[in-house]
Amino acid sequence: MVASIMLVFQLGLLLCLLLVCGLAPGFYCVRRLPWSPMEKLCGGAGLSLVLLYLAAWGIYCLSPRGAAGAAVQTGAFVVVSLICVWLGILARQDLSGLLRSPRVRRVVLGFAFLLLWTVVMLAMIRNYSGFGWFGDWLEHFQRSLFFLHRFPADTPIVMGYRLPARPPMMNVLVAFFLAQTQDRFELFQVASAFLNLLMFLPCCLMLPALGLARRPRILPLVALFAFSPVVMENATYTWTKSLSAFFVVLAFWFYLAGWRKNDRLRMAAAFLALSAGLLVHYSAGPYCLLLGLHYLLRVFWKRPRKWRELAAIVVPCALLLATWFAWSIAVYGPSVTFQSSTSVTFARQYQGNNLAKIGANLFDSIVPYVLRSGLTYSGQLNPAGVLRDNVFGFYQVNLIFGMGLAGGPLVLWLLWGFIRRHSARAREWPFWRLLIPCCIIVGVAVVGERDPFGSAHLTLIPLEVLGLSLIAAAFPWRRVAAIAVVAGCLVDFSLGVFLQARVEALANTPRRTVFAAGLNLRSGSLQPTHNSLSGMAWQNWYSVHRFALSRQYLGSLAGYLPPDPADRQAASRAQAQLRRVLDEDARYWQGWWQRHDYTLAFLGDDVAGESGDGAVVPQFELVILFLALMGALLREMRPAPPRRLPQRPPSRRSRR
């Protein structure tokens, strides 16, 4: 009971820190700029994250190092948070003025609803799984602990990576918040979900720029995000692609606005956002390349004071990127820094023709695997697992249906309409007609491996959420389109969101066994003895329980003395293997598992309880939220009643 109360308190403190530190410092800096309220909201959030990263990274690099596994100086992080609170107090009148904007209020309420929706989903999840996805969620937790607990530089990362294989910004940000609460995985989940949901803000900012409605509404975009399997999976799965997409979409807005208004500050903000996105995830690289080329070839030579603007772009971006790359080169060397990413390592391992690989990956990212080759992951005891994995592959790794069953085709239809007719925004739509295919081709080209299931989830998430924004900008939809979108949302939520969370809620209870592992004496390894879902789902479960299971079987073997010498040798080898597994806690995690009693708990585990009965509550809540949101969307789709003009009384003719 005390632990549950402490977790609730820590979650409340975490949300307060996320709200204050995620907006106040950046908004204080931009509050007096001649920007729109939405630009101040989104730009303030983006700049706040950059400033927090710089502060946390400076603390990590400059504070005195203690023993491996010791937490970074918490007091320094508290000071940074207090400064954020102070800046928020100084800007309170401007914040009040910002919230007086009706559009900002609707966006803030929409984000709050999406955060509630996502936390309810996290309260369901007890084991990450889906298709062939494995381990990334645990890897990013270890990376955050790396910066929080000052792991030695030579600490290996799970999945066989080195630290420079992925950029650090989101992991450093999460470490900043964990340092002021606790290094629990449940808090890591909520902090990651909050940061990943931020991409909703620049998508709302982009709505007017899409040119389909003079006053675009926010509710349709809220519904499309909540019902999107891709958005919700990337929000609940604790990796970093969605936060990178936040910076990329924000950069698109500031780039177009700076180009249209000849505004040097907005143009510099666009490339600073791209640099931040690259520090979150290298999937922002294609967008940095293409926007940089477009600026140099199409925009730069026509800009007033172009060299001063170029300096205003290059210097801040170079300084921001140097915080990571200069440090990594100094610690790991240039070879590890630039050649340990998955794009480089997988490209080296691929033996075939690169052009053929790019073409095949592009085709497979457009045509779903289930339509090309039939069902996969079919050898599962649970039919819901088979359906979930095939639906997961249909949505998550596909460029078209990643925007929804009906949303993807509708986006293609809307884009085709813009191509056919001359748009009023003649300056911007040619930009999109060029950028979209280039981003798709380059985004697939940088994928190192050959993936027959599709590669859209690696680099194309910014385009997918912009596609959802395009659908929302077209609201109110025509009758046929409205029926298709609503029906598609029902299918997307049922099969892509709710079913996914429902299968991820499956875990062992006193009345049901979903996963189990037994010791193979000959190999000395733990192997599945019962698995209701796919092999990858079992691997994700095993990665959480491997230390506890190793301790359990090591204790069982302590008194095991078989009469057969061969069996004794096998038992001795098994004990040695189990000890090697336990030694990985010190090697990879610097004793984190031991300090936490070899237990990693999901937020869904805390809600479900030991009996598992509590798991029903968030499922019921998610259905209620779905009905409420769908009802609000249907009410929004009703045609407005005609306004009745006041009738003038008949004029009296004067009698003569």
Task: Show the residue positions of the predicted features.
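Transmembrane-helix motifs of polytopic, lipid-linked glycan transferases
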Residues: 24-28, 80-93, 186-212, 250
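Perimembrane helix-loop-helix junctions
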Residues: 254-257, 261-265, 287-318, 326
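Membrane-lumen/periplasm interface segments of specific transmembrane helices
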Residues: 309-392
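Membrane-embedded, hydrophobic transmembrane alpha-helices
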Residues: 1-105, 397, 581-640, 655-656
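Short acidic/glycine- and proline-prone juxtamembrane loop motifs at membrane-interface regions
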Residues: 230-244, 282
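Hydrophobic, aromatic-rich transmembrane alpha-helices
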Residues: 24-31, 296, 379-428, 467-470, ...
